[in-house]
Amino acid sequence: MKFLSARDFHPVAFLGLMLVTTTAFPTSQVRRGDFTEDTTPNRPVYTTSQVGGLITHVLWEIVEMRKELCNGNSDCMNNDDALAENNLKLPEIQRNDGCYQTGYNQEICLLKISSGLLEYHSYLEYMKNNLKDNKKDKARVLQRDTETLIHIFNQEVKDLHKIVLPTPISNALLTDKLESQKEWLRTKTIQFILKSLEEFLKVTLRSTRQT
């Protein structure tokens, strides 16, 4: 998967990439036009290294948030109790999604990445709404940077209508399920969301390096 440009990028371009969509996306509801339509005549083009740099930065944000939520406890970092407690099924990239070296298919992989990141939107919204103070601020930044990645990957998809969007009904059911959790389980759930997104982005990062 290559993100090619006909021009060289200035070192500060990465900062521009981080800021390009800070106000472009909603924070409460996913609509097709919000994420899959780009009417800008000269939309920015990103290099593979830029996209990889942003993914790496988001991964760092995730790890730092997980450490803070766990107070640096390694057992907490590796605990999957939240999965057993609430049976969450978060987006993950499987072998047949075209993102691995064996059986790599760029278009199928791009569709999976875009659809998966869109599905994470409700989880990140839940996380932001259930954290306080500086943790809420960090969750807001993570959500914004993830939306920037959605914007970038959507630019590479040939047929935007093939991107799978969560339906309003499924979003509402998921929100009700998450918000109905007991208070003591919410931190575990947030940890699991972060861990799942981390794994999703690790595979995404490797896929951007495929030829």
From Swiss-Prot:
Gene induction: In activated follicular B cells, expression is induced early after influenza virus infection. Plasma levels are highly increased upon exercise, due to enhanced production by contracting skeletal muscles.
Domain of life: Eukaryota
PTM notes: N- and O-glycosylated.
SUPFAM superfamilies: 4-helical cytokines
UniProt-annotated location(s): Secreted
Primary localisation category: secreted
PROSITE patterns: INTERLEUKIN_6
Signal sequence segment: 1-24
Record keywords: Acute phase, Cytokine, Disulfide bond, Growth factor, Secreted, Signal
Positions of disulphide bridges: 70-76, 99-109
Tissue occurrence: Expressed by dendritic cells and macrophages. Expressed by activated follicular B cells. Abundantly expressed in the central nervous system (CNS), particularly the hypothalamic region.
InterPro entries from the UniProt entry: 4_helix_cytokine-like_core, IL-6-like, IL-6/GCSF/MGF, IL6/GCSF/MGF_CS
Pfam families: IL6 (PF00489)
GO molecular function annotation: cytokine activity; growth factor activity; interleukin-6 receptor binding
One CC-aspect GO term: extracellular space
Any one biological process term the GO annotation gives: interleukin-6-mediated signaling pathway
Phenotype reported upon loss of the gene: Animals have normal T-cell numbers in the lamina propria but the T(H)17 cells are reduced by about 10-fold. They develop mature-onset obesity and have disturbed carbohydrate and lipid metabolism, increased leptin levels and decreased responsiveness to leptin treatment. Animals have impaired liver regeneration characterized by liver necrosis and failure. Mutants infected with influenza virus do not show a significant difference on germinal center B cells compared to wild-types.
PANTHER family: INTERLEUKIN-6 (PTHR48494:SF1)
Biological function: Cytokine with a wide variety of biological functions in immunity, tissue regeneration, and metabolism. Binds to IL6R, then the complex associates to the signaling subunit IL6ST/gp130 to trigger the intracellular IL6-signaling pathway. The interaction with the membrane-bound IL6R and IL6ST stimulates 'classic signaling', whereas the binding of IL6 and soluble IL6R to IL6ST stimulates 'trans-signaling'. Alternatively, 'cluster signaling' occurs when membrane-bound IL6:IL6R complexes on transmitter cells activate IL6ST receptors on neighboring receiver cells. IL6 is a potent inducer of the acute phase response. Rapid production of IL6 contributes to host defense during infection and tissue injury, but excessive IL6 synthesis is involved in disease pathology. In the innate immune response, is synthesized by myeloid cells, such as macrophages and dendritic cells, upon recognition of pathogens through toll-like receptors (TLRs) at the site of infection or tissue injury. In the adaptive immune response, is required for the differentiation of B-cells into immunoglolin-secreting cells. Plays a major role in the differentiation of CD4(+) T cell subsets.
Family label: Belongs to the IL-6 superfamily.
Quaternary assembly: Component of a hexamer of two molecules each of IL6, IL6R and IL6ST; first binds to IL6R to associate with the signaling subunit IL6ST. Interacts with IL6R (via the N-terminal ectodomain); this interaction may be affected by IL6R-binding with SORL1, hence decreasing IL6 cis signaling. Interacts with SORL1 (via the N-terminal ectodomain); this interaction leads to IL6 internalization and lysosomal degradation. May form a trimeric complex with the soluble SORL1 ectodomain and soluble IL6R receptor; this interaction might stabilize circulating IL6, hence promoting IL6 trans signaling.
Protein name: Interleukin-6
Gene giving rise to this polypeptide: Il6
